[in-house]
């Protein structure tokens, strides 16, 4: 009986820890949608819709993107700062790609994050927390 209680007590104590270590794939994903590419003088402007259905506010959500031309060659590497990313909120961010024609953009790769923090603390596996889509002619993927 004493052994049974000790095991039960150990399980009860570890249960909150298991809940706290839920993986980034659990729960709702942050949606990133490449909505539109617009030609501008000297380049291309991208409109990205961010949908954060979670209760988490991100102080920094800074993307590393690689832009591939229609032939599959990397045209541009971009650091896109998105700060803050508020909980339960949809926002649109624009970023300009100089010296890149919108017609030449074939794919945009979310290669990773330069910085991903919440409450001043680094957030693990930010790439796993997002779901990508595109309404533009270019593919948006990770």
Question: What are the functions of these language-model segments?
Answer:
Residues 57-60:
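Short acidic/proline- and small/hydrophobic-mixed sequence motifs that coincide with surface turns
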Residues 71-104:
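Intrinsically disordered, low-complexity Pro/Gly/Ser/Thr-rich segments with frequent PxxP/GP/PP motifs
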Residues 51-55:
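Short solvent-exposed strand-capping/beta-turn motif centered on an Asx-Ser/Thr pair
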Residues 99-142:
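Terminal connector regions
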Residues 2-12:
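Bacterial N-terminal signal peptides
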Residues 20-44, 49, 136-140:
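Low-complexity, acidic Ser/Thr/Pro/Gly-rich terminal tails and inter-domain linkers that flank the onset
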Residues 13-19:
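Sec/Tat signal peptide C-region and signal peptidase I cleavage site
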């Amino acid at each position: 009986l004493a052994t049974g209680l000790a095991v039960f007590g150990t399980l009860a104590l570890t249960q909150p820890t298991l809940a706290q270590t839920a993986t980034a794939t659990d729960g709702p994903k942050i949606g990133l949608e490449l909505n539109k590419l617009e030609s501008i003088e000297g380049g291309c402007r991208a409109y990205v819709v961010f949908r954060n259905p979670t209760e988490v506010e991100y102080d920094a959500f800074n993307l590393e993107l690689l832009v591939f031309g229609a032939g599959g060659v990397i045209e541009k590497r971009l650091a896109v700062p998105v700060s803050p990313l508020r909980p339960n909120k949809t926002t649109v961010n624009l970023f300009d790609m100089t010296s890149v024609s919108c017609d030449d953009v074939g794919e945009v790769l979310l290669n990773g994050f330069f910085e991903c923090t919440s409450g001043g603390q680094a957030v693990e596996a930010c790439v796993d927390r997002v779901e990508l889509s595109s309404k533009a002619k270019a593919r948006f993927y990770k």
